[in-house]
């Protein structure tokens, strides 16, 4: 089992330095550091890079909620140190497939976010085929 910690406090005005201090305090207990959507918007890919450089042995999840431009967006996140990116399951199959393809090329991972999916039981096997 892996334990994930979400960094979504950017909306509350927290800084990258404050996030790093918090992660340091729970370092031994967490496996995945989620750089939440609000952090992605506020700090950009440079924020992902700063967290990865500070904690290189932790998995960094960039919660980008990709809807289009899947290949380009995921390649960018991976190049800045993300180990996992999110893509929305409601996006078209080509977008999801492009994110998965980008991940495979650099031995990284994808999390398909089921937010707003009306029939999750139907969508899961569709996504698994990609």
Short names for language-model regions:
Residues 1-62, 66-71:
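Conserved N-terminal beta1-alpha1 strand-loop-helix module at the mouth
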Residues 69-130:
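Conserved anion-binding
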């Amino acid at each position: 089992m892996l334990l994930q910690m979400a960094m979504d406090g950017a909306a509350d005005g927290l800084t990258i330095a404050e996030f790093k201090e918090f992660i340091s305090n729970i370092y031994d207990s967490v496996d995945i550091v989620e750089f939440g959507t609000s952090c992605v918007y506020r700090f950009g890919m440079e924020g992902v890079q700063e967290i990865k450089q500070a904690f290189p042995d932790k998995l960094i999840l960039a919660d980008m909620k990709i809807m289009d431009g899947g290949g380009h967006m995921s390649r960018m996140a991976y190049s800045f140190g993300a180990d996992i990116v999110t893509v929305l399951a409601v996006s078209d199959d080509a977008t999801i497939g492009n994110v998965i393809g980008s991940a495979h090329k650099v031995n990284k991972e994808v999390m398909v976010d089921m937010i707003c999916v009306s029939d999750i039981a139907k969508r899961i096997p569709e996504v698994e085929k990609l």
